[in-house]
């Protein structure tokens, strides 16, 4: 049976790149994002190009009812099968700690951590059931089920003016660790992919400081996600850091 994935933040940037990469691998998908029109355009493209089933589930990850509805739509469409929950939706706003508005912290917390936590919680029964299925009919591999979260290198190494964003991404890394501790023996594991600056609309403000050819591409991140979901259930990868050339992960 075809593997399925629910991808949030799928209308552009990293989420869209992940959708394209998995569709090219024959996955059936549910694409979620706040704005319906770009989702429809991408879904039509993937159906035509790869012949896969693609559902769209518009919803605001800052709204609890929308998050619930996104999960429900995927599980209904694919009879409760969920091989990969890809948490790509995210938002970031820069500002020093001293003057950062708490309302902006609350919004980043809602989108970057609360929604992923809720989706993991609501999808866990389906992830467990999918992980219990037999080996892949073609490859013979028992993949289990995966949660893959797009985190950030700032969740590992602090950067000035990104305290709120970094804190939510560090929490996302911790959430993946907790999923592994609680669920990996049953075949459900989680991986946080933590890239540095990725060349997307969200980082366009960096183009005057960092050459675009030196930035990580959305396709780089998508390739790492595809690699993780191709592993057997015996391989648990808690996190993957992606840095640009010449950078250091850990500071002395």
Language-model segments: residues:
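Active-site loop immediately N-terminal to the catalytic Tyr-X3-Lys motif
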Residues: 98, 157-163, 214
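Conserved glycine-rich Rossmann-like NAD(P)H-binding loop of the short-chain dehydrogenase/reductase
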Residues: 25-42
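Residue(s) in the substrate-gating loop at a strand-loop-helix junction
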Residues: 152
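Active-site helix of classical SDR
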Residues: 120, 168
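C-terminal helical subdomain
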Residues: 185, 192, 200, 208-250
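Conserved glycine-rich cofactor-binding loop
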Residues: 11-12
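Substrate-binding pocket helix/loop in short-chain dehydrogenase/reductase
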Residues: 96-97, 101-109
């Amino acid at each position: 049976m075809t593997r399925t994935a629910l991808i949030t933040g799928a209308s552009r940037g990293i989420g869209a790149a992940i959708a394209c990469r998995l569709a090219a691998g024959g996955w059936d998908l549910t694409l979620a994002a706040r704005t319906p029109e770009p989702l429809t355009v991408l879904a039509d493209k993937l159906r035509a190009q790869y012949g896969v089933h693609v559902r769209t589930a518009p919803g605001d990850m800052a709204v609890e009812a929308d998050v619930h509805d996104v999960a429900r739509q995927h599980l209904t469409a694919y009879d409760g099968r969920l091989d990969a929950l890809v948490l790509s939706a995210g938002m970031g706003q820069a500002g020093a700690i001293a003057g950062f508005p708490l309302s902006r912290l609350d919004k980043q917390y809602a989108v970057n951590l609360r929604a992923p936590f809720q989706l993991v919680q609501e999808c866990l029964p389906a992830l467990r059931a999918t992980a219990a299925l037999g080996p892949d009919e073609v490859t013979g591999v028992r993949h289990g089920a995966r949660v893959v979260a797009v985190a950030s290198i700032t969740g590992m190494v602090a950067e000035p003016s990104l305290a709120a964003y970094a804190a939510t991404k560090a929490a996302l890394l911790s959430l993946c660790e907790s999923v592994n501790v609680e669920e990996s023996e049953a075949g459900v594991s989680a991986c946080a992919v933590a890239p540095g600056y990725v060349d997307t609309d969200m980082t366009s403000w960096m183009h005057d400081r960092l050459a675009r050819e030196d930035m990580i591409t959305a396709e780089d991140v998508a390739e790492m996600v595809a690699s993780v979901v191709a592993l057997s259930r015996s391989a648990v990868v808690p996190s993957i850091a992606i840095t640009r050339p010449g950078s250091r992960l850990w500071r002395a």
